[in-house]
Amino acid sequence: MAGHLVNYGKHRTRRSYARIKEVLDLPNLIEIQTNSYQWFLDEGLKEMFDDIMPIDDFQGKLSLEFVGYQLLEPKYTVEEARQHDANYSAPLHVTLRLTNHETGEIKSQDVFFGDFPLMTKQGTFIINGAERVIVSQLVRSPGVYFHSETDKNSRVTYGTTVIPNRGAWLEYETDAKDIAYVRIDRTRKIPLTELVRALGFGSDQDIINMFGDNDSLMLTLEKDVHKNTDDSRTDEALKDIYERLRPGEPKTADSSRSLLYARFFDPKRYDLASVGRYKVNKKLSLKTRLLNQVLAETLADPDTGEVIAQKGTKVDRQVMDKLAPYLDRDDFKTITYQPSDQGVVTDPIELQSIKVYSQVTPDKEINLIGNGHIGKKVKHIVPADVLASMNYFLNLQEGLGSIDDIDHLGNRRIRSVGELLQNQFRIGLSRMERVVRERMSIQDTATVTPQQLINIRPVVASIKEFFGSSQLSQFMDQTNPLGELTHKRRLSALGPGGLTRDRAGYEVRDVHYTHYGRMCPIETPEGPNIGLINSLASYAVVNPYGFIETPYRRVSWDTHKVTDKIDYLTADEEDNYIVAQANSPLNDDGSFVDETVLARHKDNNIEISPDKVDYMDVSPKQVVAVATACIPFLENDDSNRALMGANMQRQAVPLVNPHAPLVGTGMEYKAAHDSGTAVLANNAGTVEYVDAKQIRVRREDGALDAYNLMKFKRSNAGKNYNQRPIVTIGDHVDVDEIIADGPAMQNGELALGQNPIIAFMTWNMYNYEDAIVLSERLVKDDVYTSIHIEEYESEARDTKLGPEEVTREIPNVGEEALKDLDEFGVVRVGAEVRDGDILVGKVTPKGVTELSAEERLLHAIFGEKAREVRDTSLRVPHGGGGIIQDVKIFTREAGDELSPGVNMMVRVYITQKRKIQVGDKMAGRHGNKGTVSVVVPEEDMPYLPDGTPVDICLSPMGVPSRMNIGQVLELHLGMAARNLGIHVATPVFDGANDKDLWATVKEAGMASDGKSVLYDGRTGEPFENRVSVGIMYYMKLSHMVDDKIHARSIGPYSLVTQQPLGGKAQFGGQRFGEMEVWALEAYGAAYTLQEILTYKSDDVVGRVKTYEAIVKGEPIPKPGVPESFRVLVKELQALGLDMKVLGADKKEIELRDMDDDEDDIVSVDALAKFAAQQEEKKAHEAAAQATDGKSANSTDDKK
């Protein structure tokens, strides 16, 4: 027997073909959300308050300090929040201390800071009753970046950017003449040396002493001449910089000093964040920069004088290991520079400096200047950073240092929920700070309390804005559990502070070698967002700095054996190592079998001897995301089709009776477990009671846990969200075990589709171009039947003319239409409704006339319907018919919170049972998608030799050109699994190979080619060739024909052009575009074309007259002028062109005469004419009433 048995949960055993030992369990798949939010509650919030507080007033009399905060119990449970359209949130209370420095009085007070949305256990938020997900964002990390460009004359220019988390950008660049410039905050450039002078190093000699006689520096000093000799060099530089930053304002050295200080060295205005400080220190420290350089001086121990490294030594790893402890010391090779008193910062600056030889001219000595030892707590930039980064920049021309790749995942980091929330909260708090300062100066200092100073409005508003309308706060994709899980693990490069679709080039979207094990190279949307929206790889985790780490098995450096010690590496750490592939064959003791090993180093794939290998992959599936890891035989599919397969699994509709795949990958259990749709046991114990709605588990400590299941709830996508117990009374359950399946799950595994018998053969041309031929059995036995629940709402509001009323008494409606309404006019649960049926009877007052006193009295006594009302009932929309599943009524009397002006709200849920039908979209897991073209009676389908009819026929032409051969392998293995009565697991890149597949086929007693003779169901004759028949997992996707099919009868028209609207949602028409008009012109179908462009479109009068003619059975009159032509004429007239329309007799045609449009009449005679028309009209009306209300004339109809 090929393969071995593996248990997935307690309810499923699969035969696994994996050969590679599982060294590491997958992490919790939604921890990127939950951990980040937990960090925010534990630390992030406090950090924010500590940043903003204490707040002092302008005179320094009062100060407001932060003491602590607490979140109280949430007002609603998760379920109640869903029902009430409310937020699942908890009140945030902050303790503040107000100190009066004049009197020494201290007041402490608890201040309510608004309701703060809480994250559910599943990693989502409930905002206004809907589940939302905050997508993590991929952004450039703050830090120092160096880049180079080659111009058309092959000259290399260099550039540097210092990117903060917030604050001004600092950029250095060289031009074609090698002069170095600096830009502050994207303004005009000034010579680099001016910034050095402004920092307090005024003379040329000071600058040369610090940086050495670099060519570019010398050229820059020549350009930077002393223009105004009255000022010192430092003052002149300061004024120059001020002029660039604030052009047009009077410049003084003092104002420039304070401006520069505020731009870069003020922690309130400039923030690198902890990650920025970490990146800057890492880039500028001598530890990283000395590696592979040749020393131009001898380095000795400062205490003993013992030589550590001789002059001329090349610093390799061994030398660096000796040097590292010294480089961490404050007294090793440290030079202190004292800026002049005129500089921006006057404190002494400590730099670490070591001489090395140039890579370009080998005997030239170069200063390497590091930024010293700046603590993690310093979140702003300091002069040492500026000088060290300038030194790095100048040294690039000498071949020292490296250029940064912006798409490298060491330079891109993830902002998860916690950080995004923190940034939003900071915005709210800083707005609040301004208000507090103003109030401090206004209020009486003796009596003021913290409560009076605080205005929480800006804080509440910024949080509400973030959850309600941020690009990263998204309505959760709840089609099935995999869609949910993937949405929470999504990484987006879009959003505030990120890229925009149109600006993102090819490089950003492309797969980068650092994606390996961190981001999935396959799962990304097709279309404009390709490569900008990615998915976290299955084993990847996010470290505290926001960089993605992936696990590797450590290879012992002395024995060269692979150990089970796991290290998580970021992308830039991994660049230092050589990593072997997960499928490298190992001996039992962990040593490599082969003489050479396939390995990766940076972006190279290399063959190398085992003693050079540092790490080894933990698993072959660490490269891909969860959805991709659910595709069996992924290694045999072309990547484009695998991309479609991964994306389409998320669109699979949960079926009534789901089945887990016969051929799985072993990922199904973990995906279902972590998605949050299943019910997990919180504690171990024994099941005491089970029914469809509740499971009760007796814990080991004697307490009882009750788990309520969700039954037939509507998911965000309008699908049926239903949970079913999979345990029975007496079962023992463990902590975290699945005790109830969610939607699209079976026995604790993901079950997105079914396992039908599929034949690759054409059938009467019905499966041409990816069409699918289905057997009627799939319809009859409800194999692909799904339940859909739609929610409809009706509100009774107060209007100016009186309140709307929910009632059975609806004007002009027969008893037949009211048969399913109760006494209040609300439809009963269980009623079957069709399109156009009334769900909630509602009338709105028309209020034509004001009631007289007598009428009001009569109305008060007898409650007579003296008032005119309009029927504004809620009706079933087109295609919305089904069975009423639930009705919820919310009223003020019952204590429900309703929006202002609403007296009552009724919510009706309609359930539809949709069987598979022609037009529905289906797909396998390999990107093999199609639409159903015909449903064939079971007896007409081709059948196997044992008489079993095939369920689906797919076109064999869909395979070769698309190169997704995985589907064929799955087909054969699926058939073998069915015959053997087993489920199999074939993990990605480590699944069943050729030998395993054919061994299993043989074991199942199938033919050696895996094919079968098929017989035509209509004639009973065998087909000429043997056909590939087997079991393939096939899903029904949420693109169903019922949601798309649409036809217009009489519907709304666009306001300006008077043409019918478009689209199903607007009940619109089909667009007859320019090319369709050409087609009719080519056929000479003049009359057809004329009516399409007039009656059926925007000839307003013609429409009405045509309708009238059809009703009366008269011939249809000639069409008039289309409204859009009038719009064109009016637009030309508006441009001042005297546009007139002439008839065939060259006489002007008055457009308004043609269609009786009174609105355009301005002149006095025209008004007189209008009055005469009105008189005539009244006479007509009287005559019409006399002849027993025959149809009114067309102008009146139009009115």
UniProtKB/Swiss-Prot annotation:
> Where does this protein have compositionally biased stretches of type Polar residues?
1188-1199
**GO molecular function per UniProt:** DNA binding; DNA-directed RNA polymerase activity; ribonucleoside binding
Q: Which UniProt keywords apply?
A: DNA-directed RNA polymerase, Nucleotidyltransferase, Transcription, Transferase
Superkingdom of the source species: Bacteria
Catalyses which reaction(s)? RNA(n) + a ribonucleoside 5'-triphosphate = RNA(n+1) + diphosphate
Protein family according to the UniProt entry? Belongs to the RNA polymerase beta chain family.
Q: Which PANTHER family match?
A: DNA-DIRECTED RNA POLYMERASE I SUBUNIT 2
Its biological purpose is as follows: DNA-dependent RNA polymerase catalyzes the transcription of DNA into RNA using the four ribonucleoside triphosphates as substrates.
A Pfam family (short name) is RNA_pol_Rpb2_7
Record's subunit section:
The RNAP catalytic core consists of 2 alpha, 1 beta, 1 beta' and 1 omega subunit. When a sigma factor is associated with the core the holoenzyme is formed, which can initiate transcription.
Recorded protein name is: DNA-directed RNA polymerase subunit beta
Q: Name one GO biological process term.
A: DNA-templated transcription
| Disulphide-bonded residues | none
- Its source organism is Lacticaseibacillus paracasei (strain ATCC 334 / BCRC 17002 / CCUG 31169 / CIP 107868 / KCTC 3260 / NRRL B-441)
Q: What is the lineage of its organism?
A: Bacteria, Bacillati, Bacillota, Bacilli, Lactobacillales
Q: Where in this protein does the record put region Disordered?
A: 1175-1199
Please state the Enzyme Commission number of this protein: 2.7.7.6
Q: Quick check: keyword Aminoacyl-tRNA synthetase in the entry?
A: no
InterPro entries hit by this protein: DNA-dir_RNA_pol_bsu_ext_1_sf, DNA-dir_RNA_pol_bsu_external_1, DNA-dir_RNA_pol_su2, DNA-dir_RNAP_su2_dom, DNA-dir_RNAP_su2_hyb_sf, RNA_pol_bsu_bac, RNA_pol_bsu_CS, RNA_pol_bsu_protrusion
Q: Name one GO cellular component term.
A: DNA-directed RNA polymerase complex
